[in-house]
Amino acid sequence: MVGEGPYLISDLDQRGRRRSFAERYDPSLKTMIPVRPCARLAPNPVDDAGLLSFATFSWLTPVMVKGYRQRLTVDTLPPLSTYDSSDTNAKRFRVLWDEEVARVGPEKASLSHVVWKFQRTRVLMDIVANILCIIMAAIGPTVLIHQILQQTERTSGKVWVGIGLCIALFATEFTKVFFWALAWAINYRTAIRLKVALSTLVFENLVSFKTLTHISVGEVLNILSSDSYSLFEAALFCPLPATIPILMVFCAAYAFFILGPTALIGISVYVIFIPVQMFMAKLNSAFRRSAILVTDKRVQTMNEFLTCIRLIKMYAWEKSFTNTIQDIRRRERKLLEKAGFVQSGNSALAPIVSTIAIVLTLSCHILLRRKLTAPVAFSVIAMFNVMKFSIAILPFSIKAMAEANVSLRRMKKILIDKSPPSYITQPEDPDTVLLLANATLTWEHEASRKSTPKKLQNQKRHLCKKQRSEAYSERSPPAKGATGPEEQSDSLKSVLHSISFVVRKGKILGICGNVGSGKSSLLAALLGQMQLQKGVVAVNGTLAYVSQQAWIFHGNVRENILFGEKYDHQRYQHTVRVCGLQKDLSNLPYGDLTEIGERGLNLSGGQRQRISLARAVYSDRQLYLLDDPLSAVDAHVGKHVFEECIKKTLRGKTVVLVTHQLQFLESCDEVILLEDGEICEKGTHKELMEERGRYAKLIHNLRGLQFKDPEHLYNAAMVEAFKESPAEREEDAGIIVLAPGNEKDEGKESETGSEFVDTKVPEHQLIQTESPQEGTVTWKTYHTYIKASGGYLLSLFTVFLFLLMIGSAAFSNWWLGLWLDKGSRMTCGPQGNRTMCEVGAVLADIGQHVYQWVYTASMVFMLVFGVTKGFVFTKTTLMASSSLHDTVFDKILKSPMSFFDTTPTGRLMNRFSKDMDELDVRLPFHAENFLQQFFMVVFILVILAAVFPAVLLVVASLAVGFFILLRIFHRGVQELKKVENVSRSPWFTHITSSMQGLGIIHAYGKKESCITYHLLYFNCALRWFALRMDVLMNILTFTVALLVTLSFSSISTSSKGLSLSYIIQLSGLLQVCVRTGTETQAKFTSVELLREYISTCVPECTHPLKVGTCPKDWPSRGEITFRDYQMRYRDNTPLVLDSLNLNIQSGQTVGIVGRTGSGKSSLGMALFRLVEPASGTIFIDEVDICILSLEDLRTKLTVIPQDPVLFVGTVRYNLDPFESHTDEMLWQVLERTFMRDTIMKLPEKLQAEVTENGENFSVGERQLLCVARALLRNSKIILLDEATASMDSKTDTLVQNTIKDAFKGCTVLTIAHRLNTVLNCDHVLVMENGKVIEFDKPEVLAEKPDSAFAMLLAAEVRL
């Protein structure tokens, strides 16, 4: 490979000796060999290429032919070259960046300087190739065309001299093409390496943080997609302007030589316009910077919308989110329009400036009555057209440089923001696993605080984000002794105060406390996620962590449990059994190879939590940090997991168990009670009970809650539970959870359950794959875009403006030829001696003013058409992208939940980030250049055909080769683009998943390299075609030059000059036109991918609705009736609710119980019509809910979800997004949910910021805010889906009482695992396998010893 070898991490070998020049540049030097017949068979053919193969992209020919013959996939492409891999390049870039930081410090470190060092040798080689190319490009149009035209004027001229000049012209053009291709060959690999190096480095830096406090997922997606591509384009285009000074000096000198001082007028036009372009680029950069900030916000909001879509639908908040996103999009569009106007002006400058320079130069020359001949005039035109290159490349280069500058600044912020040094130390005693001595910790670290403006410090101090942990442990309800923010000094706000305890090897430490008391923060402190202010935190041994909200990534169950570990059959089976997953896995369609949706969407909360626990158990670590892992499972499963997993399997391991289920603390070796971030009590369970302090009171409260109702209600269950033998009890308890017909196989379960899976497992069971066929550009794609841009008339008008602008430039040159011909005839006359007169001289007395005014007017018209074109084109393209954005968003918004279960969020985010960036910025840029170049090619061919009709025969013969090449190229490049598009979505999914699970993983595999090498092939394919096109055009140039030479006086010299000046442009212009056309079509792939959603997304409400079927005050009572109701999540999947016939009276409170996966949450989805019934229906107050609009239905119901959801915004926005309630009402509900004191402590009160995922509040506090949100809705029917699972018993009781009081007279459905939350219900509904097996009053069911409810109750009593 020509250029520097960024294959080596340093100049030293493994022994520390400096590598020789030959060793360092060995791969590059081998590529300099013209032909390498005996090259080694490298995995990637580019590594075996010699100079000719490398420069002409011949190494790619087999791939192009294969793409023509068959469909390309990731597997059929050659593997990535090791020299282009992300690993190799990122390591080298890391070394250079570290050196820069060490030299000048992180703040002064220049990322652009490191980028230059990373690729400077390659860039210099590229510039050398470009200079050679530009010299050849200048010699042909200036020297040779002038000589050829002069030769045609000499009647005594020798033919062989003319032919020799034509051959020389062909040779210079061919050499130009070769060096141009070589420059791009170097460029593409340079750009690829820079892109992968920085993308990988940024990603590695992000995952090195244990928690992200400074960047959102939306910003990460934007940086790793749009910003990394900006760097790719910068590496391609930024070296090109280095050739401009050489080109300008060469052309200026020759123009002065043949034209005289007036040539300086044209040169000065170019010189003046270059700083104008620089200014416009700066302006464009400023608008782009502002737009990127708004784009980040839109992508972040979209990510939040897609992540929380279930709750948004259940609350009917679609309008609120639609308004938010549309408002952001409107702001983004305004900024993009401003950037688009500037960019469009820059793109139009190239043809405009060359026309202005030509017209002004020749007009002034004539006004000064200087001699002007056709050879001189058209040599000057040809020369100025070559100089047009300097203006033509500047928009690309300046745009790329400006965007790269913005991108580098954003990336630098990430690279210099180092993860704070670990405060974790090793305890001196090897038997001590955990040691905290007077440890005080905070979530904010000193560096970030110092860099924060003073006026924001107070707010930032309280709004620091965290990952899956509880912040603000001081804000527990009731908040005794907590100091408000206004009472804080400049010192950092501590969250954990003076924590001291020791845990020995093999012990179980139980941690309890109220919501927000600091339990999760304590685990975060042990993980090193917080900031130590004073004291010591010592940890010994390897860690496993189970977060409070389970993190599940897209894959199958087994992959989630193994998490990259080797599969050990015995260990795996044991882990599955002790985590109570055997039954769940046997019920899944493909066992443990069943595909899981993103974030575990197709699993219940309990299943997600136990898979997360199984991951920890299988990892076989020394220390286990378990954050409330049993809150989401029923009593029987909870007891099994605690006994079999925590007490037995983890025996000998050290376990720190945070729990709200206090009954498990009795089995812990030591218990810590936290309050306000401090250890309130500490000791064994027995010691703490004897002290009769807060802990003892909590335990007594728990027992009181269980037995405060009439004792006979539970005595029967207790007697039944204890009169049987242990074995019988286990068997009976097990019967509850076995599916019908499975009892006889129960004894075999440990054996047969070991596989959990059929031998044939479909590759994609749940998540629909993005087929390579998706994104194929058809006429429908263009039709969709044209309709979105305002229709066919507006589109035709826009294209017509391009025609007028380019036509004005062509007309000016044609008019000049006409003028020169007229002057020639007037001067020489029919009788004149042609050898004695000034051929083509334009005299002052032949009506020059008419010709001159028309000639000048053509320039003015071109300016007018150019400005109008830029305005209309920018408006039209942004209208199209905004219309498509809104249409796709609306379609996705109205899609059913099954769509979101089967479509990865990463794929949807790809559409709204990368694809929208393509539509907003890159498609207009490439389309505008393509249309300009296309009409230039058309006018050139028309003029050539008019001057030399015979050239059409040559064009026809060359067209055959052109179409063969085009067919191979088009098929091949389309296949490559599809592979690139399809491979991009998993990368987005991977980024999103990694950012969400950052508290659990600190490093994850990278897929960037695989996407990047598809990009390399795609771009190399463009150059493969371009080179071969240029060779064909050179043959055409040679033919036209011969015709000019051999035609002598049969055609006027001005016509010959006009045809030669144009044909010399066609050589490079046609291939650029085809390339930009292909790029434009490739960008239209994004339109097609969006069109797929527009055409295929089916709205969730497919039933015809009757207008006015919803009574005004409905529902007035809240009676719910299920009639023969059946439901399945998707077609061809098993029923999850089967033949439900159920009547719930108005005002009743119904507790819904059953083991994990029994259908409890599905009942809620049916009620909200998140899934339409397979058969049967549901009546509420005798109204069939299936004939109501979804908005009417869902606004009348309220849900408090299992996983608390808060949105980015303010506290007020989260409670009341439509602002339909007063502040007083909001404070009232906060008071009733014990959150008033917490919110009052925040500087902005109700307007206080809520960060991404609500992570500046603890999980319990988030749930309390969700309860407050529900209280505001004032519904007659309330669904509590495990609503208090994340709360301690005391807060749970308070909230339950609040709910009971606030929703008096309402129908309340409570889904719960902890039976104490349903004991006071009017009725209990027991679910199993999607069926109702019991529905009665709790006392009635408890008195039946064989009832399923009694057995569940007995299992909990035994705990």
UniProtKB/Swiss-Prot annotation:
Glycans are attached at N405, N438, N540, N981. GO terms for molecular function: ABC-type transporter activity; ATP binding; ATP hydrolysis activity; ATPase-coupled transmembrane transporter activity. Residues 467-701, 1120-1354 form the ABC transporter domain. Gene3D superfamilies: ABC transporter type 1, transmembrane domain, P-loop containing nucleotide triphosphate hydrolases. It is found in: Endoplasmic reticulum membrane. It is a multi-pass membrane protein. Residues 451-466 have a biased composition (Basic residues). Residues 123-403, 795-1082 form the ABC transmembrane type-1 domain. Residues 446-491 are annotated as: Disordered. The chain crosses the membrane at residues 125-145, 159-179, 231-251, 256-276, 348-368, 376-396, 791-811, 853-873, 934-954, 1031-1051. GO terms for cellular component: endoplasmic reticulum; endoplasmic reticulum membrane; membrane. Expressed in testis (at protein level). Widely expressed at low level. Isoform 5 is specifically expressed in brain, testis and breast cancer cells. InterPro entries: AAA+_ATPase (IPR003593), ABC1_TM_dom (IPR011527), ABC1_TM_sf (IPR036640), ABC_transporter-like_ATP-bd (IPR003439), ABC_transporter-like_CS (IPR017871), ABC_transporter_C-like (IPR050173), P-loop_NTPase (IPR027417). Keywords: ATP-binding, Endoplasmic reticulum, Glycoprotein, Membrane, Nucleotide-binding, Repeat, Transmembrane, Transmembrane helix, Transport. ATP 1 binds at G513, N514, V515, G516, S517, G518, K519, S520. ATP 2 binds at G1154, R1155, T1156, G1157, S1158, G1159, K1160, S1161. GO terms for biological process: transmembrane transport. Probable transporter, its substrate specificity is unknown. Belongs to the ABC transporter superfamily. ABCC family. Conjugate transporter (TC 3.A.1.208) subfamily. This is ATP-binding cassette sub-family C member 12.
